Regions:
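Catalytic-core regions of core metabolic enzymes
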Residues: 1-266
Length: 266
């Protein structure tokens, strides 16, 4: 199950927050502040005391308890940061937008393994790393644009590619498509597309849940899980439009270099 602290946090910390909205840490904070989020927002940057009007802490250790962290710092600093958040700050929701993990080299893959091990120990959930983020009707935890006005009757969009998320949102918004949630899972180090489908299935409410799901996949960690929950959602009246990339040799190389995906014939 996906932790409630990721889905509906009462407090969010942006680690690596910036006043420069051209940087991920700046655009994340801007999008979060402009979203529907009603909880507490904290920022961390060792060089700042205030970022975009929000009090800034110089160290993660100085933060109060926080439900969810959106992390935009160099990969090498992420394992220790996650460790502090998970074990000292009670954090269970994590979005890591930083690159430099399993998609890059073995050292990055080791960082990823350490992070997942830590988050699993506290029963938390991770989107990413190497992603553009996550947004639902509770808050926007993404650094890309455009950010759609979310609609409970819109589609749930799940993608392994942040660039594809941007393209689909841009094209969809100009053609009348609305969104209920957008999950850009990146490397899928812990939460993958099949886990999002499981969440959409097990929390499905015929009165309030979206009936349309769009999926762009670069890898499938657990094909049987994906099929099980896809079938269940379809039986509940949902429609699913899915594309699996990486079928050709060129596509496989692109997926591997992009998110570390090992494309197969699935």
């Amino acid at each position: 199950m996906i932790a409630k602290e990721l889905l509906n946090p009462k407090s969010i910390a942006v680690i690596g927050a910036s006043g420069d909205t051209q940087k991920p840490g700046g655009s994340i904070l801007r999008n979060l502040l402009n979203s529907n989020f009603k909880g507490e927002v904290y920022t961390v940057n060792p060089k700042e005391t205030e970022v975009q009007g929000v009090k800034c802490y110089q160290k993660v250790e100085d933060l109060p308890q926080v439900d969810c962290a959106i992390i935009a710092i160099a990969a090498k600093f992420c394992p220790a940061t996650v460790n502090t958040l998970a074990f000292e700050k009670g954090t269970k929701g994590f979005i890591i937008v930083s690159a430099g993990f399993s998609e890059e080299n073995e050292q990055g893959a080791e960082f990823e393994r350490q992070i997942v091990e830590t988050i699993n120990k506290v029963g938390g959930s991770l989107i990413g790393p190497n992603c553009t983020g996550f947004l639902n009707r509770n808050y926007c935890g993404a650094f890309d644009s455009p950010i759609p006005t979310l609609d409970p009757h819109g589609v749930d969009f799940v993608t392994g590619s942040g660039a594809t998320a941007v393209f689909i949102k841009e094209y969809g918004m100009t053609n009348g498509l609305t969104f209920n949630s957008v999950w850009a899972v990146g490397n899928s180090a812990q939460v993958g597309i099949e886990d999002v489908l499981e969440h959409l299935d097990t929390t499905f409410d015929p009165e309030t849940s979206s009936r349309v799901i769009m999926i762009y996949m670069e890898k499938i960690g657990n094909p049987q899980k994906l099929l099980k929950h896809s079938r269940s959602l379809i039986n509940k009246g949902c429609r699913i439009a899915a594309i699996k990339s990486g079928g050709s040799a060129a596509g496989s190389r692109a997926a591997s270099s992009h998110t570390g995906a090992l494309a197969t014939d699935d």
